[in-house]
Amino acid sequence: MAQSFTGKKRIRKSFGRIPEAVQMPNLIEVQRSSYEQFLQREVRPGVRKDEGIEAVFKSVFPIKDFNERAVLEYVSYEFEEPKYDVEECIQRDMTFAAPLKVKLRLIVFETEEETGARSVKDIKEQDVYMGDIPLMTDKGTFIVNGTERVIVSQMHRSPGVFFDHDKGKTHASGKLLFAARVIPYRGSWLDFEFDAKDVVYVRIDRRRKLPATTFLYALGMDGEEILTTFYDVVPFEKRTAAGAEGWATPYKPERWRGVKPEFALIDADSGEEVAAAGTKITARQAKKLADNGLKTLLLAPEALTGRYLARDAVNFETGEIYAEAGDELDVTSIEALAAQGFSTIDVLDIDHVTVGAYMRNTLRVDKNAVREDALFDIYRVMRPGEPPTVEAAEAMFKSLFFDAERYDLSAVGRVKMNMRLELDASDEMRVLRKEDVLAVLKLLVGLRDGRGEIDDIDNLGNRRVRSVGELLENQYRVGLLRMERAIKERMSSVDIDTVMPHDLINAKPAAASVREFFGSSQLSQFMDQTNPLSEITHKRRLSALGPGGLTRERAGFEVRDVHPTHYGRICPIETPEGPNIGLINSLATHARVNKYGFIESPYRRVADGKPLEEVVYMSAMEESKHVIAQSNIKVLNGEIVDDLVPGRINGEPTLLQKEQVDLMDVSPRQVVSVAAALIPFLENDDANRALMGSNMQRQAVPLVQSDAPLVGTGMEAVVARDSGAVVIAKRTGVVEQIDGTRIVVRATEETDAARSGVDIYRLSKFQRSNQSTCINQRPLVKVGDKISAGDIIADGPSTELGELALGRNALVAFMPWNGYNFEDSILISERIVRDDVFTSIHIEEFEVMARDTKLGPEEITRDIPNVGEEALRNLDEAGIVAIGAEVQPGDILVGKVTPKGESPMTPEEKLLRAIFGEKASDVRDTSLRLPPGVAGTIVDVRVFNRHGVDKDERALAIERAEIDRLGKDRDDEFAILNRNISGRLRELLIGNVALSGPKGLSRGQITAEGLAEVQPGLWWQIALEDEKAMGELESLRRLFDENRKRLDRRFEDKVDKLQRGDELPPGVMKMVKVFVAVKRKLQPGDKMAGRHGNKGVISRILPIEDMPFLADGTHVDVVLNPLGVPSRMNVGQIFETHLGWACAGLGKQITTLLEDWQAGGQKQALIDRLTEIYGPDEELPETEEELVELARNLGKGVPIATPVFDGARIGDIEDHLRMAGLDPSGQSILYDGQTGEQFKRPVTVGYIYMLKLHHLVDDKIHARSIGPYSLVTQQPLGGKAQFGGQRFGEMEVWALEAYGAAYTLQEMLTVKSDDVAGRTKVYESIVRGDDTFEAGIPESFNVLVKEMRSLGLNVELENS
């Protein structure tokens, strides 16, 4: 396989045996595709699909005024270019958004008074600005007010119809009460439910229940129609046969199966008895009777008793009703009907066994009998207290379920409904129909009769994903509907003939709804930017919480649990550990979301036991119809080897015959998410620990030096590429220039005139992430390197050579060491601190604003009252700290003074005033100082000035530096373009005939020497004889001019933005941001972890010479407790240790061979060793230079990939240990660093990938003497952020009580807490050097007294 630019610098050996049938999709595709469908920014207005913003506008427009004199129609929309690019938005705290322009058409009608005919009087079209819509960056994020945010996708219950029961909890008898619920995408919910008496009721929007037949009456049905819809009708005809009189009915075998008749069955045609009374008729007998020609049965009159009439018995001449449909027949009523001449009676086919009388009983309970009463009943339930009228009730009922404005099932809802109810309505049919309601009721009654299954709401076929686009579409619709009301009112109140569309529109509600969604929605989250993996996982997260979703309190176990349909769709491992467990999930690696919002997983087709190349994506509903084999089944020559293979049918694991199989998994890792797929030997870890491992990888802090893991899974490169942390080449080309901040590439693959032939990649240098970690990119290329499109040309945070590198490979020994690794503590070597192995840089941001106050403007200045020169040493003349200054807690970063109000003067001030005749300083010091716990280096300062405020010297210096940078970019790009065009011009001119030209060029054929005499800038003046060549020369000249103009225009545009004032909050004149880089070395109290959930806190840093060492004198870096493994069952870490040990051993061998070769030995020995390690199929570098680079990179260890569920076996590990010349047990003899003695038994030593987590002791340590107090209780605040105190709670009080330490206790509860007067006195006495104090009344007692008084209980304190 062809290797990438970084791939050939360090080849990762894979142990995977199963070939990937499908390439991994882009990991942030979920976000991107959803938002692209919403905006349709690249699609021309005429051909846009009816989705996203287009669908919203079409659903709200046209808007008519109240008397229909005018209509405002929607034509199309388009986005303008965003005002600032992503980088500028982050720097200026702005939102990266594009203005939305909508073309609207206002049509005004006039009506003729005589005829009432309408005609168009006027049509006006206009583009109207409808606010800004945030744009998504290439990384799938949004920049809102300068911070990167992610919109998390939401899982919610799919629209459609669901059947369920109460699990026997409602009624004491444990009877199952079935219910059906029709859930639309938007609109009222419709519930049908049984009660304990088997009567069917309906609820609309969970309000008071009504008999279900009321709803059917409202739909226009009558009692007889309802009964004949739900039940078959059986005719009984009065007849005499063989002297016996009875009622004849057609014989249907299925109706008599398993029945024990109370009376003899007689053949109505022959008069014979075909079945005796009291004997059970078997299925075989019933069929045999039909085969013998039995057509009609004659039953005794008693057989009709207890049956129900299917139709009204009416005398059509007199109109008299003898019996109504649904009436129960008894002997008397049967005789009465026979006496009235009814020779045929139609009854309902209800036998109370397979068909129950539920709808008939409901009809009996229902007191309504006509549609009008039913509508009134529904109206009273929905709008209690309003007197109903027929029109109002009719309109309300229609608007509830049958009006597309108010009710929308959505395409998904209709598809789901069609599937569940076996209907075939078009998915354009978004409202309910009578047929739907009847089908729901029939299925519900069928469930009660024991036919069919209820739905599983946790099945992923019944849950769907709402991604960014859909969430924003719903929000925007709400905003437009608010706007619609305002437009209608305005259309009625203005002179419609003179207004233009923009006069009618106030876009604020629409813009506000978008702003509110991005700013404060539960699903719009501050991006977790700790490292590239945490970014990617955040974008792939699925949350069941949020508006329209679940709440933590209400969610039970079932919703949170892993479901068989999660396989290949949602990761069963990665989920938070707290109250959100199971509610927040992660998308599996290969999963994607289809157009209906259902998660699909890929499968390979299998035909006749042969896996095909074809890959299909299936949702949970489609998958249930297939037989699926696992991906690790043996396949030889395109055919499955084993006759029985493991697989699953409908989610249940089983053994299958290979002929049964019609699908198979594409990859073993398709089950898990990205974070879980990064854990090697995941298959050997307990699931709980794997969960912690995948969660802790997201908390790994980017280190100063990153190492890709020796033992990886092959996912590292994919994650690094898709996360956006690395820089990827857009086009094939050659590296022209390079420095720490940018890479300039001359494109070689295309000569498209419209596109520049130069790509300039700007690198992020020491930028602050959302979590204050450091974003820094480093180039991987050299000048002259040839790169291809898609190659990684610069590493980012936590990446190395284009692979994810969250931590470092550390040499670990599993052994106890003097109790310093008790309870998961970690003992580390001083070498790790000395060599900055786990050192990280954190960038803190501080900002200060100079406001215009009532007493005058605040000022940012170096001139601060009562501050010595020492404190100002780092400030420049503008009062702002210099870049590169080392600062300590309490140092001034930005000097600022605030005007003081006129306060009454003290006698001393009056004296000074009298002597010097001037006002003492009238400003106070409000400078920005570095808070405690932060010390570091200033890496960046940004100054923002309000429009029209003069810039200080520092702001101008920053601006000049930025303009120089932009100018350099422009000049470099122009120079390369110029060189390109000059080269093409040179090729064109040489050999052609010149008619005229600049001075120094002779006429006739142009030669290279002749051309060299003339400056390249003058070549344009040459006139050629060949017209075609002259045309090419002109087009090159045009291209040259266009490029120059384009570059100049872009430069001027950027400079103009720089020089313009900044948009600051109201009342702010100037704002300064200071960025401090803090270097955090590893220290006791920091939290570290491996990738297998093996976490611990550093207990001690031991001098190198005291650490245990190997026979060759190498000291180990980390000592871990072996007791942390057995009970936790994360054995993966032991396998990783052994394999890491083998990798390092092989690396040492390669280094030795390389040194031998460079010292004059054989190159072939190195190549042979590499071939032995990688196998004969691996492509090794062709040039010596590349081979040396590869060997150097492998010196630290040969990196290997052990994919999840398809990784290295124990045999492979032993083979590699032997290959590296190590003991196949993976254990080594260790010596005690303190005594030099050998430990009693061999110890497991090897390399583990260790991470430093974002729980650093420096961020947690905190102390306070005095500080802020709570306003009401006057007790100290809590927490480091508020500079709070230590809580002295109930239990601590009990402890002091137990010791009888009365004075200490009194001190804790009064002067050290909320006795305001007492604590002031203590402060004074400490200043005096006195150590006595008096406790007063705590403020909390006063609060209690006030609360009692508010309850009307007067409490007064008496001095006794």
Curated annotation (Swiss-Prot):
CDD domains xref list: RNA_pol_B_RPB2
Pfam families xref list: RNA_pol_Rpb2_1, RNA_pol_Rpb2_2, RNA_pol_Rpb2_3, RNA_pol_Rpb2_45, RNA_pol_Rpb2_6, RNA_pol_Rpb2_7
GO terms (BP aspect): DNA-templated transcription
GO MF annotation list: DNA binding; DNA-directed RNA polymerase activity; ribonucleoside binding
KW tRNA-binding (keyword) present: no
EC number: 2.7.7.6
Entry's Gene Ontology cellular component terms: DNA-directed RNA polymerase complex
Reaction it catalyzes: RNA(n) + a ribonucleoside 5'-triphosphate = RNA(n+1) + diphosphate
Enzymatic class: transferase
Assembly and binders: The RNAP catalytic core consists of 2 alpha, 1 beta, 1 beta' and 1 omega subunit. When a sigma factor is associated with the core the holoenzyme is formed, which can initiate transcription.
Function: DNA-dependent RNA polymerase catalyzes the transcription of DNA into RNA using the four ribonucleoside triphosphates as substrates.
Official protein name in the record: DNA-directed RNA polymerase subunit beta
Species whose genome carries this gene: Caulobacter sp. (strain K31)
Record lineage: Bacteria, Pseudomonadati, Pseudomonadota, Alphaproteobacteria, Caulobacterales
Gene: rpoB
